[in-house]
């Protein structure tokens, strides 16, 4: 999820940095949502870790992830929130897995 003060077109590429991760269960399967901030967004680039976000923004994200698949009759549960360091580790692991599977 990219927190941005501007509207972004679907499939846009935006230079971002991770501030945290929301771990959840999506229809019974583990799912991790990396929360990112655009490098050049003056509204949000003051935040370096998910713990710094205003409570209402954090609550909106958690609520969204808890209901966003309701129309598909699928259950989602927000489980845990982890910091920037954990999100960065997940991104690095995913890059390594991509290289292993698609670049050799």
Predicted segments — roles?
Residues 1-104:
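Hydrophobic N-terminal alpha-helices or hydrophobic patches in metabolic proteins across all domains
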